[in-house]
Amino acid sequence: MDTTAAAALPAFVALLLLSPWPLLGSAQGQFSAGGCTFDDGPGACDYHQDLYDDFEWVHVSAQEPHYLPPEMPQGSYMIVDSSDHDPGEKARLQLPTMKENDTHCIDFSYLLYSQKGLNPGTLNILVRVNKGPLANPIWNVTGFTGRDWLRAELAVSTFWPNEYQVIFEAEVSGGRSGYIAIDDIQVLSYPCDKSPHFLRLGDVEVNAGQNATFQCIATGRDAVHNKLWLQRRNGEDIPVAQTKNINHRRFAASFRLQEVTKTDQDLYRCVTQSERGSGVSNFAQLIVREPPRPIAPPQLLGVGPTYLLIQLNANSIIGDGPIILKEVEYRMTSGSWTETHAVNAPTYKLWHLDPDTEYEIRVLLTRPGEGGTGLPGPPLITRTKCAEPMRTPKTLKIAEIQARRIAVDWESLGYNITRCHTFNVTICYHYFRGHNESKADCLDMDPKAPQHVVNHLPPYTNVSLKMILTNPEGRKESEETIIQTDEDVPGPVPVKSLQGTSFENKIFLNWKEPLDPNGIITQYEISYSSIRSFDPAVPVAGPPQTVSNLWNSTHHVFMHLHPGTTYQFFIRASTVKGFGPATAINVTTNISAPTLPDYEGVDASLNETATTITVLLRPAQAKGAPISAYQIVVEELHPHRTKREAGAMECYQVPVTYQNAMSGGAPYYFAAELPPGNLPEPAPFTVGDNRTYQGFWNPPLAPRKGYNIYFQAMSSVEKETKTQCVRIATKAATEEPEVIPDPAKQTDRVVKIAGISAGILVFILLLLVVILIVKKSKLAKKRKDAMGNTRQEMTHMVNAMDRSYADQSTLHAEDPLSITFMDQHNFSPRYENHSATAESSRLLDVPRYLCEGTESPYQTGQLHPAIRVADLLQHINLMKTSDSYGFKEEYESFFEGQSASWDVAKKDQNRAKNRYGNIIAYDHSRVILQPVEDDPSSDYINANYIDGYQRPSHYIATQGPVHETVYDFWRMIWQEQSACIVMVTNLVEVGRVKCYKYWPDDTEVYGDFKVTCVEMEPLAEYVVRTFTLERRGYNEIREVKQFHFTGWPDHGVPYHATGLLSFIRRVKLSNPPSAGPIVVHCSAGAGRTGCYIVIDIMLDMAEREGVVDIYNCVKALRSRRINMVQTEEQYIFIHDAILEACLCGETAIPVCEFKAAYFDMIRIDSQTNSSHLKDEFQTLNSVTPRLQAEDCSIACLPRNHDKNRFMDMLPPDRCLPFLITIDGESSNYINAALMDSYRQPAAFIVTQYPLPNTVKDFWRLVYDYGCTSIVMLNEVDLSQGCPQYWPEEGMLRYGPIQVECMSCSMDCDVINRIFRICNLTRPQEGYLMVQQFQYLGWASHREVPGSKRSFLKLILQVEKWQEECEEGEGRTIIHCLNGGGRSGMFCAIGIVVEMVKRQNVVDVFHAVKTLRNSKPNMVEAPEQYRFCYDVALEYLESS
């Protein structure tokens, strides 16, 4: 049977064996075509014999005789005699095909008879459906049934368009004896009355490998007792799996075929059998489908590090369709797990794959039905690309540090780091040394090696190392690690720096540190020995001597040396590693003058005449050089000339002959010069013997004159000459006639005296000119010396701050700079150099103006003299004793009230122009405006000229404009050509109007002036506004800047002067040299205005002269305007401000100069073993205010003790952020302080890490002060009382504050969490979005973070978030363990970054000083202070 016919089989057949009763009821029914009584033979009924069987049925007719035994029934019927045929042969009789769409009952008679009672064979009934092949019999009977007819029914249902044909088949058995007969076949057009039958059995379709279930539903009487089975077309029986009664006339039977395959595909039918017969269903087909499978593997379209793009190639398949699902199955070829994704498109992108990994990809196809998924298709084996490395090794450690090599260890570079199986690791390093020497290099290394050595490094040098991990797709650089190489022996002392200064018996040797110290110099060793001498008596073969100097002593005095002797010095430096190579120098001591015998008390005169005197000459002893000559000098005695004392004296260095002495008027002459060989032993010599000795004439002495006779010994070596002399005799005048020398040997004395006189006059004139020049140069040098010594004086002041003031008189007496090195060693050079060179330094880096005079512009009185800058600290401390009695006394000595006429200001028409009736302009110094036409009184404005430092009328002090004077104010600005306005008040203070707003926010017209605000720069303590000023009728646009200081409190004076000093410097830098006066005003134009002007003037004076004269400056200002500097508190504040400026100096560095300046700042001074950066930090510590107990009174209250982590790190009362939200009995105190940023006051809140009992207070602080950022700089550590104070997910309530975690992400060293918080006591205020930045890059045991770059990135991330939230107005909370060093460093760097953006300068000192003014423990360690500089440099280099 073909598949189509079998699938459409609609007939249900039921067969029942009846009892051998005659059919009674059937005759009453309606007959249909197909029945036959065989009276006229089978042909008449359209019955046919099968053409393909073995033999045929035989027709027995009642009208014809037959051969049958007599016991056979009478009548007409069809019969088969089995004895005539072989066993197994079959005869088939075919009924007509039935097509009616109806239910039929086929009723017939049959018998199987054998005379011997044997089995005649089998009667089968077959049904052919739609002319298909024959199936197995649907009913059969076999064996002997007797000679009586039996009746049977067959119930059949036919459904159009199907048809069926019933076939009676007689099969001969092995007995071959008997007869098989059928008769009286009736086809009824209604169901059988007693025959059970099956409903239509449907086809079953399953996928290969699944279970197939056929369900047969049977109806009829007693059907529940039937036996059931499923019969395959080939006869295989399958037992019933389950039966279920539907009702009393119907039941269902299930048949299950396990895990079918294609071989199980066939036709199946249900068979039921009871005591009355059997029932058989139609054939239903079991259809087995093969699940589909792709023929080709997927095709690769694209590849990346974490994805693969494929085309499924699922159109060509093996198996059966339709395809209802496509899936991609993939796995790592090195792994066992698989993952499957459903696909709805012809292409698919596999995401989240591992880089550089081989994957096997297959396609799965699914058809309908259970088990419809076929086997995976052929695999595509491919590999992803490499990805950029995840990071560099975190555990970069130094395994070994030597002087010239560093061994580096790092963690194993696993795939999770490299993201590629092919990668390179490079170590790059660079370093800077002195003398602008630097080196940078990169070394490739074995990736599998756990250690690498960097060689050829300089000793004791900070080497910056970083690791670079590279693969084909990218690279990752580690943060730089700075390692200092070990010390080594130092290099040689520079030859050029080695200098020796010779004396007769000592040598002063000085040198400089080796160019390559290779560490910290611990000492210098100098060995020396004599190698030759001009004095033969000096031994030169002795052993060398050795001396040692400390590291900071680069000079030495070698005493007790031999004159005229050359010494060889070998000097070498030492570190902890030992001595380096030596540097040699030869230095020769000066020769000494010969030593003459002592003539004191000895009469050397042997004989004396009127014209001669004979003396005893004794030989001298050479000292350092042999005697070159002996000389006899004759000095004429004059009555008015002081006699020389006997013994050692100034010798006569210039040899003068008798002739030259007579012609030149010299008081002495050389009578003789004797070679040393002429005086081996004492010998007499006659002075005046009229002989010549070595070119010197020894003339007879004049009898009437007295003479002193001197004996000189001279040594001379290599242009060095030393002379020793002694008076050995005196010859008195006699009464004998004067012996006139030979005229031939004389010259005209008159002519010579005249020449000498003229020369003397010329010399005197020249001397006067030189004196005038020197005096003028000294006056000009006065200012330079004052400026040059300022920094030295500042150093003394800073050092003095931590000393006791018990003996202030010794402060300068012990100044080591006041005693030179030569003085300490009793050196007396022949020509003293009185000029001193001082280091040039700046007190204030601002523009200066040249001036003619050098005197102070103020009259310094005897009772109030100017104070040296170096004495200022001592002076202020003295004045502050006894409750500042000194300041009180000084201030009260000022004249209070009106000191000059102010008639113009008092006029009625000007009264409205004065804010206060008692602070108005003096007539003599008032600013006179050019009158407006037709208004003669319009020349008045309440303003006075004030002289600056050596600049007349450099300032204009004025009141804060009132509404009536705004136009006058701008007239004054235009008339005076002022470029800067300084405003030292707020518009309203304590509810009172202090100044009318005289400027526009955009553009405003005041009379004939148009003022436009073009720029506004708000800063924490002041605002800079830039205006353009235009006047009707003038083709000119001027720029005017207003500097508005907002940091002056409503009462008193600023707590510190740092902000005001920065403000003053900014004004100085902004005021053009050619501009007119600086206009300064507060409210009245007296108190704060006076403070500003006095500080500005005194800072100029301190720089120019090294002194300050505050008292007389205030006095001078009060002569120009009434009550300038209005309170004693302001007067003291001026002193404190100038002291702070002098101590701190100018620390701002322009961006363009920062890198070079910074490297200079960190360079170690070999003399002091310190650096400028270290000194700056010490200065910062010295000027940091110390908090007293009364400053922190609220934090010290007993109820607040348990809210403080450390009782020595408390916030001052003036900086406390008091909590607003009420939380039961809890106080409004929290250990936190408000801090200014660069642009915004109180922008930072610095606090300690919340304690377990202050977590609720912390969240109250966040909400009450609108904090949109939380910066966390330490770790959660329960052992230190640092709990997790936030919810990791979901929502938690902390007192009245509800905190909900919205998201959490990580970026490098920062975990970012966004919280949404609300105040449950004030829900109408809505939510506040807060982002927490938890910084992970700062180990608890380190003073500074491990990476400059990551810390800078943190600051910039916070800054960006702040700009996005709350229109940039939200505050930032920064906390670390104690709310000090780490938090301060974050704030300081944030200020510096803003400073660079706004002003292009770097001023770390000012940033930290500003923070410490509020809380002294900001930036605690020198490492943190230097790190601020390092990050500033990192920011400049990266931007």
Swiss-Prot record:
Main localization, broad class: other
Extracellular side: 27-752
Residues holding substrate: D1050, C1082, S1083, A1084, G1085, A1086, G1087, R1088, Q1126
Membrane-crossing residue ranges in chain numbering: 753-774
Annotated site (Cleavage): K643, R644
Domain Tyrosine-protein phosphatase: 887-1141, 1173-1435
GO molecular function, one term: protein kinase binding
Keywords, sorted A to Z: Cell junction, Cell membrane, Disulfide bond, Glycoprotein, Hydrolase, Immunoglobulin domain, Membrane, Phosphoprotein, Protein phosphatase, Receptor, Repeat, Signal, Transmembrane, Transmembrane helix
Signal peptide span: 1-26
Active site: C1082 (phosphocysteine intermediate), C1376 (phosphocysteine intermediate)
Example GO biological process: focal adhesion assembly
Keyword Repeat appears in the UniProt entry: yes
Domain Ig-like C2-type, first and last residues per copy: 196-281
Disulfide bonds, paired cysteine numbers: C216-C270
EC number(s) reported in the record: 3.1.3.48
Phosphoserine carried by residues: S856
UniProt-listed Gene3D superfamilies: 2.60.120.200, Immunoglobulins, Protein tyrosine phosphatase superfamily
Membrane topology: Single-pass type I membrane protein
Catalytic class of the enzyme: hydrolase
UniProt tissue specificity: High levels in lung, brain and colon; less in liver, pancreas, stomach, kidney, placenta and mammary carcinoma.
The keyword DNA-binding appears for this protein: no
Glycosylation sites: N101, N140, N211, N416, N424, N436, N462, N552, N586, N590, N607, N690
PROSITE patterns referenced in this protein's UniProt entry, alphabetically: FN3, IG_LIKE, MAM_1, MAM_2, TYR_PHOSPHATASE_1, TYR_PHOSPHATASE_2, TYR_PHOSPHATASE_PTP
Reaction(s) catalysed by this chain's protein: O-phospho-L-tyrosyl-[protein] + H2O = L-tyrosyl-[protein] + phosphate
Family: Belongs to the protein-tyrosine phosphatase family. Receptor class 2B subfamily.
Official protein name in the record: Receptor-type tyrosine-protein phosphatase kappa
Organism encoding this protein: Homo sapiens
